[in-house]
């Protein structure tokens, strides 16, 4: 029986993986593949047992995935940092992207440091990775936005302004115009701020906003956030 063509939640899919593990208990891929259905169905205890086994057997292959899941699904920021930094210590090549492809794992690590209150460290990490991304002409969809918000939160208003402008050029979002409005307010420019809020509302209604099918991204806003600032 082949796994191709079977749905992750199906009995057939899981049975094939179970049989693979019986044949070779060190087959890390099978543990990882089995874990995905449990994560999506909300059985996090079983997911953790399986993904931990996959990491034990092949840390280079699975640490990045587990670290990303810790960030995205569980808000286990310290655990995510630990996994991503461990992966970085094990390999001599680029540690790669998040499972959903939205972020380089170093950007995710920076966001984790922000979440635990280490904003200056977060800025340094994200600045460094964005510079590398720019050299590859592959800046993430939300990279400039997150960095701009960090600048705003640490009162580096001119840097925030410049970075939000880069986000506009790269991938305009309701969030970007919203935080740009907050920056204009800090710079004493209420007219410009009002214009940005109006633009943010238009973009939000058009659906040009941060989104993820499984969780709310960091720095995401809602329509009421815009309305409350107008």
Could you say what each language-model-derived stretch is?
Residues 1-32, 41, 49, 227-230:
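N-terminal leader/linker segments that initiate helical-solenoid repeat arrays
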Residues 7, 41, 73-74, 116, ...:
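Structural motif corresponding to the intra-repeat A-B loop/turn of tetratricopeptide repeats
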Residues 18-22, 52-57, 88-102, 131-138, ...:
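Flexible helix-coil transition and linker loops at the boundaries of alpha-helical arrays
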Residues 30, 62-64, 97, 105, ...:
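TPR alpha-solenoid repeat register
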Residues 38, 70-71, 113, 151, ...:
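Residue at a conserved register position within TPR or TPR-like alpha-solenoid repeats
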Residues 192-230:
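Terminal, low-structured helical/coil segments at or just beyond the last alpha-helical repeat
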């Amino acid at each position: 029986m082949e796994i191709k063509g079977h749905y992750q939640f199906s009995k057939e899919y899981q049975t094939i993986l179970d049989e693979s593990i019986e044949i070779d208990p060190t087959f890390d891929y099978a543990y990882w593949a089995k874990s995905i259905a449990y994560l999506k169905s909300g059985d996090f205890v079983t997911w953790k047992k399986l993904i931990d086994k996959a990491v034990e057997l092949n840390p280079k292959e699975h640490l990045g995935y587990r670290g990303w899941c810790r960030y995205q699904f569980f808000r286990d920021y310290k655990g995510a940092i630990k996994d991503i930094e461990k992966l970085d210590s094990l390999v001599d090549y680029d540690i790669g992207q998040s499972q959903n492809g939205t972020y380089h794992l170093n950007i995710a690590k920076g966001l984790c440091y922000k979440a635990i209150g280490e904003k200056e460290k977060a800025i340094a990490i994200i600045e460094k990775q964005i510079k590398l991304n720019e050299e590859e002409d592959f800046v993430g969809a939300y990279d400039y936005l997150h960095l701009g918000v960090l600048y705003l939160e640490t009162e580096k208003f001119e840097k925030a302004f410049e970075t939000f402008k880069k986000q506009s050029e790269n991938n305009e979002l309701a969030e970007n115009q919203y935080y740009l409005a907050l920056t204009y307010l800090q710079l004493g420019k209420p007219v410009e701020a009002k214009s940005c809020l109006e633009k943010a509302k238009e973009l939000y209604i058009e659906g040009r906003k941060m989104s993820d099918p499984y969780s709310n991204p960091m720095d995401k806003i809602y329509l009421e956030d815009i309305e409350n600032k107008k």
